[in-house]
């Protein structure tokens, strides 16, 4: 399993980007979450079954939705012992 954390910057808050991300993740049967950060970025934690699944998700993120403008995606691989387990993918408020 691949566990990744993303920090997305650009025009990503107030434009439906979290909902867009949740839709993609749920369509791909991913687990994790998406949430807005106080500094204007969006944080995503996602668990993938395959590298191909991860690459597809990242490609869709880079394109964003029609209202967003993605300037940068910072990616971090999470430790195998990442403490949270998820049953689905959801938006944290």
Curated annotation (Swiss-Prot):
Pfam families: Acylphosphatase (PF00708). Keywords: Hydrolase, Plasmid. The active site is at residues 18, 36. PROSITE patterns: ACYLPHOSPHATASE_1, ACYLPHOSPHATASE_3. It catalyses: an acyl phosphate + H2O = a carboxylate + phosphate + H(+). Its EC number is 3.6.1.7. Residues 3-93 form the Acylphosphatase-like domain. Disulfide bonds: none annotated. GO terms for molecular function: acylphosphatase activity. InterPro entries: Acylphosphatase, Acylphosphatase-like_dom, Acylphosphatase-like_dom_sf, Acylphosphatase_CS. The keyword Hydrolase applies. Gene3D superfamilies: 3.30.70.100. Belongs to the acylphosphatase family. NCBIfam families: PRK14432.1 (NF011006). This is Acylphosphatase. It comes from Borrelia garinii subsp. bavariensis (strain ATCC BAA-2496 / DSM 23469 / PBi) (Borreliella bavariensis). The gene is acyP.
């Amino acid at each position: 399993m691949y566990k990744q954390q993303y920090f997305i910057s650009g025009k990503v808050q107030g434009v439906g980007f979290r909902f867009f991300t949740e839709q993609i993740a749920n369509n791909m049967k991913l687990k994790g979450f998406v949430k807005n950060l106080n500094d204007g970025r969006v944080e995503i934690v996602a668990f993938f079954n395959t590298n191909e699944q991860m690459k597809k998700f990242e490609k869709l993120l880079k394109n964003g939705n029609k209202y967003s403008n993605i300037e940068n995606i910072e990616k971090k691989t999470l430790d195998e012992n990442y403490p949270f387990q998820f049953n689905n993918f959801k938006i944290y408020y």
